Amino acid sequence: MFERTWTVRFSDTDPHGIAHYPRIVDALHETSDMFMQEIGFPFWELADEHDFGFPLVDVGFEFDAPLYAGDEVRITLTSDPSTRAVRFEYEGYADGTLAFSGYEQRVCAETGGGGAVEIPDEIREQFVDHVAE
């Protein structure tokens, strides 16, 4: 499992002072960026160096409690890889309370529209290793 802290800023909130959902989605996407960088395969290098990437094909979230400016949110990411895709599952907690949960489904695909390919073993191993932690 990968974990990081996101601080909700005033600029992340709506006129009622509650974190606006697109900013939460941004925080989750940033979490997957950070995870991929930590395992040694940043999204931004995959296309240039390996001729494939992990485009987003499905996303879903449920919001359980509001978040406010100043909240420190512990975001967890758990990866669930298959042969040609990976599902990133997220949970966000503020003061120990589940604020949201969700997922991103990403397919391993060749650049230039070549279609889905198998996740390389060295990346899949990193996904599996982070589940086992």
Regions found by a protein language model. Name each.
Residues 11, 57, 91-93:
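Short loop/turn motifs enriched for small/polar and acidic residues
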Residues 1-55, 111-133:
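Hot-dog-fold acyl-thioester-processing enzymes
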Residues 63, 68-69, 80-133:
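HotDog/MaoC-like acyl-thioester-processing domains
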